[in-house]
């Protein structure tokens, strides 16, 4: 598959990189067939050297004899041969090998042509080659464009699931459902020992260690023990003064990520906590709890 200069300039960097990978993979696949003598095509050399691989005139694979831009030649041990178009060779898409039922159209002989395909022992393909899901090489351009489009969408990391309360978007619906607990104050995970409830199962598991009394993580500064290693690291910042979390809006630093998240709401105006009675919104949970006492 080849691009003219105009076509090449329309591709973005991601598409060009993908084209590079696909073309070199296809070249290596053909080599692995051991059916061709392969002088390296100019387009592959350009890709390896980091040069732009566009051509002056975008060639198309033909069903008739003539020049082929790939420069591939079938292995040949006879002088009497006929040129064969690469587009007529059917290659199995999934396994990357030529099918035992590959159809080869042999056009009228045209002598003296360079960079064409010489047919050798037509039809004597290995009988053990699989036959399923064959695709012609002439469809590579369409397949590549489809692959580029799919890859571009994946890179964009589309997030179709949107929270109606704060506008935050998510890639999967399950993440949206979990996020919405922030607004609804839903806490589906309950401790069977003290009836305390939690929004996340991970928080419940951490809480259960407080009942077990196991605190294997000890601060070397003050001797205080913790049930979770993360809690120990957070605590140690009170001794070291470390503040690794930085607000990119104002440059203010924080020792805990949760403190940074709360601070960011002063810039974004986000108010994720909603009163279930009057629907008023708050940026901090503590503010919501104080407000709810007014309804009692």
From Swiss-Prot:
One of its GO terms (molecular function) is RNA polymerase II transcription regulatory region sequence-specific DNA binding. A zinc finger (C2H2-type) spans 161-183, 189-211, 217-239, 245-267, 273-295. SUPFAM superfamilies: beta-beta-alpha zinc fingers, KRAB domain (Kruppel-associated box). Transmembrane segments: none annotated. One of its GO terms (cellular component) is nucleus. InterPro entries: C2H2-ZF_domain, KRAB, KRAB_dom_sf, Znf_C2H2_sf, Znf_C2H2_type. GO terms for biological process: regulation of transcription by RNA polymerase II. CDD domains: KRAB_A-box. May be involved in transcriptional regulation. Belongs to the krueppel C2H2-type zinc-finger protein family. This is Zinc finger protein 75A. It comes from Homo sapiens (Human). The lineage of its organism: Eukaryota, Metazoa, Chordata, Craniata, Vertebrata.
């Amino acid at each position: 598959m080849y691009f003219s200069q105009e076509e090449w300039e329309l591709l973005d960097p991601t598409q060009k990189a993908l084209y590079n990978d696909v073309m070199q993979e296809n070249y290596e696949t053909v080599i692995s067939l051991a059916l061709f003598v392969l002088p390296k095509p100019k387009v592959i050399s350009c890709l390896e050297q980091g040069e732009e691989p566009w051509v002056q005139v975008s060639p198309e694979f033909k069903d008739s004899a003539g020049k082929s831009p790939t420069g591939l030649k079938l292995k040949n041990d006879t002088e009497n041969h006929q040129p064969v178009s690469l587009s007529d060779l059917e290659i199995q898409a999934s396994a990357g090998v030529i099918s035992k039922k590959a159809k080869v159209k042999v056009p009228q002989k045209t002598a003296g042509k360079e960079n064409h395909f010489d047919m050798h022992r037509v039809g004597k393909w290995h009988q053990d080659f699989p036959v399923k899901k064959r695709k012609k090489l002439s469809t590579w351009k369409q397949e590549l464009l489809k692959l580029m489009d799919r890859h571009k969408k994946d890179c964009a990391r589309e997030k179709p699931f949107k929270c109606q309360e704060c506008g935050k978007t998510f890639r999967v619906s399950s993440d949206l459902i979990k996020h919405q607990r922030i607004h609804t104050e839903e806490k589906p995970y309950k401790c069977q020992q003290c009836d305390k409830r939690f929004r996340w199962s991970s928080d419940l598991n951490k809480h259960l260690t407080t009942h077990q009394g196991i605190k294997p993580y000890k601060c070397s500064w003050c001797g205080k023990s913790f049930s979770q290693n993360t809690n120990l690291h957070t605590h140690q910042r009170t001794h070291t003064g470390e503040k690794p979390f930085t607000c990119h809006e104002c440059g203010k630093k924080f020792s805990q990520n949760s403190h940074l998240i709360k601070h960011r709401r002063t810039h974004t105006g986000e108010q994720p906590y909603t009163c279930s009675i009057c629907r008023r919104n708050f940026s901090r949970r503590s503010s919501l709890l104080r407000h709810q006492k007014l309804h009692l």
